[in-house]
Amino acid sequence: MFIKTNKGQVDQKWYMGLTYEDDNGNDTDYTIETDGNIAAVALEDGYGDEFGIIKGEEAYLNINTIIKNIDKRFYVDATNNLVMFTDATKTYKTKIGGKTINETENTDYVISFMDGKNCYVNVKFVKKYVDFDYKVVKAEGKSPARIVLKYTSGEKNQMTVKSNIEMRTKADYQNLIVTTLKKNTKVTVLEESGDWTKVGTDDGFMGYVPAKKLKDKETKKTDFKSDADTYTHVLMDKKISLGWNAITNLTANGNLETIIEHTKGLNVISPTWYSLSDNKGNLRSYASATYVEKAHSKGLKVWALVNDFGTQDKASKEYTKKVLTDTTKRENLVDNIMTNIKDYNLDGINIDFEFINKDIINSYLQFLRELSIECRKAGKVLSIDNYVPSSGSEYYDIAHQSLVADYIIIMSYDEHYAGSKEAGSVSSMTFTEKAVSDAIALTCDASRVINGMPFYTRAWITTPATDGKKGEGVYVEDATNGNYYLSSQAITMDKAKELYTNAKVKPTFDETTGQNFVSYEKGDSTVSIWLEDATSVKSRLDIMEKYKLAGVAYWRLGQETDSIWDTIYPYFK
């Protein structure tokens, strides 16, 4: 059978991501400001978004390529002219453009350099701390230089080319040729789909060949060494029952005995003592030695909370960015935290940073790595609060956090929140269970995941919209039932009971949320409350048992009914 084939050759620079489209729509080669040659970066399943640079015999990767593909523990601080790597016990600092590590260890190569705003790191420096393979292929003819990377452990299939055959850009004879593979060339199978197979060569070519042109499939196992077992964790020998204690001034510390008077089964308390006070890494503190002494006398561990939103304004966000992205300031923050741990005899620390965006996530993770080293040395617990796993919070990288932290706390509430366009539960059981299971999938260790649960709920007020009259809350358009205004108020368990008791209504069980629910009319409005009570709390504790979690955390102490501890206690006695 005659097969019409395309004999055209693809522009390999374009194919490997070494060109860009200029303002006139023309493909233009990337250029660099420094000396050296641009090289394509062949990842395990495609070409990297960032090119590499070859200087003489030395090969350099964009640090973003390293972080995204090889190891997230590399970090660049352009402000202080540093490239760093942090493991379980130490941070290795190098000056950009230098050859020395931690000012004591000399190398025979330049470790890193800047090209414009981009940082490039020598593959030898990366290889010093991380087990992976690389191969440097020099440019030849129309083929650009390539840095070929292998970094994932596991099994992959290899096959042999039966006879000379063109590798193509896509799975069809009409697509352009990448290169010609010679008979008996060994290739790694990247993707199998019908008549065509995507393959990669040891020298960094990737593309499609007819499946019938391959033979002798064999499985090759790669096992790169990992240092994950060097990350020891400070863990409690019992299920954790943690209560956050909102402290907004020094006087509030005096209420400790009142706030824990009716608790049963509580074994950790987390006072919200610390927040960033400036852009230098200093802390605003409401810490109290007397508070810690009393808590310890009651058998409670104290994990003081540090947040980055203490002033709840634009300044707080700026503090977070400026402190975390500057190594000098970030280290000052770590030092201040550890000083407070020592001075107040704290058992651990709870990090609750919520002003983290994608631009500073690498700096936040570096902060956690650096803090974890000091906590590990001191034998103090490091717990980190996180939003419920979702596409919007994915960049927080719970998987990497769990490597360095002792416990990951998932704040499984605010499913519906102030400003929501829909009334609903603060934390339905389906929402909670998904949050827990997703967190376990990311951490791979349920025994270090703590589920944060609400001790509060919301009273939702729905008011029909009338012409010319503006209501309170969010305006919601509803073509079926009529437009309305929706507002809500956070309320305690006792307040919720007071409201529905005064309205002379009784709760009914809502199968959808797994909670008791009340609804009643108040004037022109409808009030709806998904209750937090013994039913919902028990269900969440059952989820803790089902998934074998490390424990639970309650936001916040003082919002619960006294009797709720009778429900909690059996799980922790």
Region roles according to the model:
Residues 1-193, 223-231, 235:
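Primary recognition of N-terminal secretory signal peptides and signal-anchoring hydrophobic helices
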Residues 184, 196-201, 209:
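SH3/SH3-like beta-barrel fold
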Residues 221-331, 336:
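Glycan-recognition patch characteristic of GH18 chitinases/ENGases
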Residues 222-227, 311-312, 319, 457-540, ...:
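Glycan-binding loop/region signatures in secreted carbohydrate-active enzymes
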Residues 536-573:
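Acidic/aromatic/glycine-rich contiguous surface patches that form carbohydrate-binding/processing clefts
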